[in-house]
Every structure is written in C-alpha cells, then in structure tokens.
Amino acid sequence: MFSFLKKLSTKDNSSILAAIEKGAVIIDVRNPNEFRQGNIQGSKNIPVNEIRSKVEMIRKWNKPVITVCLSGARSATAKSVLSAAGIEVYNGGPWYSLRKIIAQQIA
C-alpha cells in the first residue's frame, strides 16, 4: 500500500553510500520546522516546493545529490525534478533511516 515506506534495499544502500563517498550533498526536502526537529548532520534544507527554483544552484555544486524527507514521498518528488534536470540524484527515503545507515558505516 505505502510502497514508498519500504526499507531501502541493499543495492540502494550501496549506491547511496558510494554517492556519499563521492561527496554527495544530502538535501532534506521537509519544511524548516520539520528539519529543526531532527536532521542528518551536514544536510541542506531545501523544501520540496522550492526544488524547481533551486535546480541551477544545485547543478553548480557538481556533486551527486541524495534527497530525504520524513517518509520518502517528498524526496521521491524532488528526485524526479532533479533527475529530469540531468543531476545525479538518489532517493534516500526517510531521513532517520539514512542517518542510521550512515552511522552503521562509521561504526
């Protein structure tokens, strides 16, 4: 029913971790209030409704991008916009899940 809530597969994890090793920028597309309640250290907060207007700025970073949100739905929307603009982008799904994956790699 809520397929966007599924856990990232091992293949997805590998791709995302490889992108992080290449210097990927994590964009949290939740609203600023949600972002302040918890986020991945070093991530940038660009709400999903602002992604289209920030495409050129994001493109200039010249780095892979990983989008996250609360459930994975808004980050999927942002991924579609960025992908259509030719940006290398991955949907990291829920921010707290990606934070756990990153922490496990560090440990």
Predicted regions and their residues:
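Rhodanese-like catalytic fold shared by cysteine-dependent sulfurtransferases
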Residues: 2-15, 22, 32-64, 73-107
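Short hydrophobic beta-strand that contains or immediately precedes a catalytic carboxylate
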Residues: 25-29
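Short, surface-exposed ligand- or partner-binding patches at beta-edge/loop junctions that are enriched
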Residues: 68
